[in-house]
Design a protein with these regions (language model features):
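Active-site-proximal beta-alpha core segment in soluble small-molecule metabolic enzymes
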Residues: 1-98, 107
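Structured binding elements
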Residues: 101
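Anionic-ligand-binding alpha/beta catalytic cores of soluble enzymes and soluble regulatory domains
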Residues: 108, 114-126
Length: 126
């Protein structure tokens, strides 16, 4: 982008926790097997770059679960990303504008599956 003298007004960085998150889900697999996303260190360097370039709208994204129906997987991902957003704020004085949890919340496709407990998800995310 710098070579082309292009600096966006908004940017989003994809985070891959790698071995820091032992479990993904059946659809995504384990994070360390994924080809996409940045490590925590790479992402923090990119945030510093974006701040230096005056980019004021910075988001973070992950895709460690998809179509998840169980609260532990969803809440674990939420907690991981909120922790990362807090680290970005504390280390770079940058407030993350948005967090994208990827494929996240699932819907039941089979009769035996229960829908996600949205009230429990909301309470757990507080």
């Amino acid at each position: 982008m710098e070579r082309l003298h292009l600096v966006p007004k908004r940017i989003c960085f994809r985070y891959n926790p790698g071995p820091d998150l032992a479990r993904g889900n059946a659809i995504i697999g384990t994070p360390q097997e994924a080809k996409y996303g940045m490590t925590r260190e790479q992402l923090l360097k990119c945030v510093a770059w974006a701040k230096n370039k005056g980019i004021g709208y910075i988001g973070i994204h992950t895709m460690v679960i998809s179509a998840e129906l169980e609260l532990p997987g969803l809440l674990g991902t939420i907690s991981m990303m909120f922790d990362l957003a807090n680290e970005i704020r504390n280390t770079h004085d940058v407030t993350v504008s948005f967090i994208d949890f990827g494929g996240g919340i699932g819907i039941p496709y089979r009769p035996e599956q229960e829908p996600v407990d949205l009230e429990g998800l909301g309470e757990g995310a507080k």
